[in-house]
Amino acid sequence: MTKLLSEYTKYGSKFSTVDISTFGILEGISETIVSTGLEYPNAAPIGIIVRDGRLFVRLFRGSHTWANVLKEGYMAANIIYNPLLFVRSTFFDLEPPEFDYVTAHRLKFPILKEAAAWIIFKCISVINTDQSLIADLIPMNAGFNEMNKMNILVPNRGFNAVLEATVHATRYQLSGDKKYLKLIQHYANLASKCGGENEKRAMKLLHEVLER
């Protein structure tokens, strides 16, 4: 691995030699599917945040990801390009055969077999409030899945629309505010217009979830 980004040298080079930019984690919020649970793996879409030189994550209280990070102090960010997997991991538990395991610091961490790449993070400086958990992240290990790695990725509005619709769907389920249904439909139309078959299947599943 290449050296750690200069923004994170405050943690000391002895902690990590992983350059997260190599894996597409840049300034802002990078949408990944995070896997946790050393014994019972779980996966859910989570944004990895880089802001003002700080690398951190925010997890909602009560989720499986929140509980596992609070208990174990580790998480794996999976770089995924399948929109259907984002929807499935938001509303359903993934099956055990969908996970693989990688070793870091003598521990075996669950990652997704479909990931193009993965990064194992140690969660430090954890702040647990009534609503959420915030933790700084130290990248411990990372790798590419050569079978899934794509050389060139062109931004696709349909894929991005699925991500936005999924976020609004979770907000609708929490609040019941119908304004989110209008936003979901807006992004569903965009996914249908600009996306491919995977995006359309993802939106179909999302609508099925909302109709339950």
Predicted segments, located by residue:
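Basic, polyanion-binding surface patches
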Residues: T2-W118, K122-R212
